[in-house]
Amino acid sequence: MRIAFMGTPPFAVPTLAALHTAGHDIAAVYSQPPRPAQRGKKLQKSPVQLWAEEHGLPVRTPKSLKSDEAQAEFAALDLDVAVVAAYGLILPQAVLDAPREGCLNVHGSILPRWRGAAPVQRAILAGDAETGVTIMQMDAGLDTGAMRLIETTPVARKSAGLLTHELAEMGALMMRRVLSELHAFPPVPQPDEGVTYAAKIDKSEARLDFLVSAVQVERQVRAFNPAPGAFFELEGERYKVLAAEVVHPAETVAGAAPGVTIDDRLAIACNPGAIRVTRIQRAGKPAMEAGEMLRGRGIAKGTRLA
């Protein structure tokens, strides 16, 4: 099939790679424009753009697809289908309508649950038992299009990073399967029941809130790993918590105030219960096991964390 691929972050790369390996005619790869790196002013290309250029695929990086010129260039590609995976730009109706089979999206949730920008993180925060990938026929709404294929996977105690990687690989195989026999996967409208929205993660959410249950705090840690990174502060220094576990109730100290350490091994009282930090990163330092850090920078029982 003659395809345009549209994607930007690492999540999108496995799908592009799968389409390339399958021998599809990739007429163009669309990705968001290079942006300044976090440190310094040098522009950094997206993972999708880098992969496409390494494999000799033509790349386009418009800031928007709203102009008549951009839409005419897209229509001139004469596509069978466009495949979209975390592109990050709104597709106008003229773009959605241009390919003969429309635009197919790889979405990291079991639609209609968690429509929107952060489905993986929101599924973890909500304590969902499972999540998955939906191959969706795109329309003008926010992840409201008809569904062609859904597959699921347990959330378990996976971090957002690990789960995103798993869903990216799953979605790539699913999209390859759908495109190999498109009309065997007819679009099915999403149900009206069970709709939830996965709002974009705000950095302010990453500060650990010890006033909630230990179970919820541990979910925060997993949901924000690797980014933006769950954290607490002590004496003006930020500590990023990369992994934690819920402490057995027998290990908690009755009456301990939320946010106060209940031993010298970085167990922290919550409301109720407690968590123990198992992997941590101090500002400007490499990540390490919590026990290793504590040997160099002890945090005594009864210390209040913010």
From Swiss-Prot:
Ranges in a coiled coil: none
GO CC entries: cytosol
Catalytic activity annotation: L-methionyl-tRNA(fMet) + (6R)-10-formyltetrahydrofolate = N-formyl-L-methionyl-tRNA(fMet) + (6S)-5,6,7,8-tetrahydrofolate + H(+)
E.C. number: 2.1.2.9
List of residues binding (6S)-5,6,7,8-tetrahydrofolate: S109, I110, L111, P112
Keywords attached to this entry: Protein biosynthesis, Transferase
Stored InterPro entries: Fmt (IPR005794), Formyl_trans_C (IPR005793), Formyl_transf_N (IPR002376), Formyl_transf_N_sf (IPR036477), Formyl_transferase-like_C_sf (IPR011034), Met-tRNA-FMT_C (IPR044135), Met-tRNA-FMT_N (IPR041711)
Top class in the EC scheme: transferase
Record-level Gene Ontology MF annotations: methionyl-tRNA formyltransferase activity
Stated role: Attaches a formyl group to the free amino group of methionyl-tRNA(fMet). The formyl group appears to play a dual role in the initiator identity of N-formylmethionyl-tRNA by promoting its recognition by IF2 and preventing the misappropriation of this tRNA by the elongation apparatus.
HAMAP family per the UniProt record, alphabetical: Formyl_trans
Family the entry assigns: Belongs to the Fmt family.
Protein name: Methionyl-tRNA formyltransferase
Biological source species: Sphingopyxis alaskensis (strain DSM 13593 / LMG 18877 / RB2256) (Sphingomonas alaskensis)
Gene giving rise to this polypeptide: fmt
